[in-house]
């Protein structure tokens, strides 16, 4: 028998908006973890392996408009085994709060705020599923083997924290802020051993990058940035041999320059 483990890529954060009551971009969701035992006789001499890429960060804006959306993380696969990537963060809005990206699951991926399947309807969204981004735009929820969801971007407030993952998936990023000079910390990745990729730390400048995953560890999410005018969000932690963390959301801008770019998702 051969045990194969795979981890999906992290979704990227959305870029911040500009003018009005602008919100920071929301953060991307973390990629999922999945594993399967194969009989040696069932494997071909060569098998197709795909490594899920992290999403590229949502674009900033230099005129009065909403920020660019992030990009969902790619799926990682070995033969029939798949771990899906995390959902994209949304670009900041000029007037409303925006939801974060959902965590990747083991049966399906997440393109926006809904976590990947399976979903039990609980806050954890199932033992193997990815977490949904909260409907109230608050802190991202934790995943099990799925990824944590990204924190939302909020108008005239600090962005929300990202959700972690308890058992091998990656953490979601934290949302970009608006009108404040600090940012929230992001969710930590899960682990199937004893350590994990750390979540990006809160900061007063560009957001902190998530810690890279190591052997069988999920990468941490990147934090949203917190400059009073503009700045860029931290990238999700690269997977290494683990899931990619979600990128943080980009900072809003009050009309004197460009908004922040969303953080890139970590690779699977």
Show where each model-derived region lies:
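Alpha-helical transmembrane segments and their immediate interhelical/interface regions
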Residues: 87, 101-105, 116, 151
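Short peripheral tails and domain-boundary helices/loops at the edges of structured domains
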Residues: 79-93
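Aromatic-lined ligand-binding clefts that engage carbohydrates, nucleic acids, or primary amines
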Residues: 2-4
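Glycine-rich strand-loop-strand elements at beta-sheet edges
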Residues: 6-79, 95, 103, 108, ...
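Generic hydrophobic, helix-prone segments enriched in Leu/Val/Ile
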Residues: 43, 103-110, 122, 136, ...
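Short, hydrophobic/aliphatic alpha-helical segments
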Residues: 6-10, 87-91, 130-136
């Amino acid at each position: 028998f051969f045990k194969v483990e795979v981890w999906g890529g992290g979704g990227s954060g959305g870029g911040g908006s500009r003018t009005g009551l602008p919100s920071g971009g929301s953060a991307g969701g973390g990629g999922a973890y999945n594993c399967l035992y194969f009989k040696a006789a069932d494997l071909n001499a060569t098998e197709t392996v795909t490594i899920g890429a992290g999403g590229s960060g949502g674009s900033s804006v230099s005129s009065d408009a909403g920020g660019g959306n992030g990009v969902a993380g790619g799926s990682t696969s070995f033969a029939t085994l798949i771990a899906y990537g995390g959902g994209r963060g949304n670009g900041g809005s000029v007037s409303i709060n925006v939801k974060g990206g959902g965590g990747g699951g083991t049966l399906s991926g997440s393109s926006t705020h809904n976590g990947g399947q399976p979903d039990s309807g609980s806050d954890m969204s199932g033992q193997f599923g990815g977490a949904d981004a909260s409907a109230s735009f608050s802190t991202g929820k934790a995943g099990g083997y799925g990824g944590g969801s990204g924190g939302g971007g909020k108008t005239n407030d600090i962005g929300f924290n990202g959700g972690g993952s308890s058992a091998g998936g990656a953490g979601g990023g934290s949302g970009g802020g608006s009108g404040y000079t600090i940012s929230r910390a992001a969710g930590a990745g899960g682990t199937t051993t004893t350590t994990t990729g750390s979540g990006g730390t809160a900061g007063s400048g560009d957001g902190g990058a998530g810690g890279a995953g190591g052997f069988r560890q999920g990468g941490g999410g990147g934090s949203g940035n917190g400059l009073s005018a503009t700045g860029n969000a931290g990238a999700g932690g690269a997977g290494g041999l683990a899931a990619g963390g979600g990128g943080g959301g980009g900072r809003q801008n009050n009309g004197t320059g460009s908004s922040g770019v969303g953080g890139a998702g970590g690779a699977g």
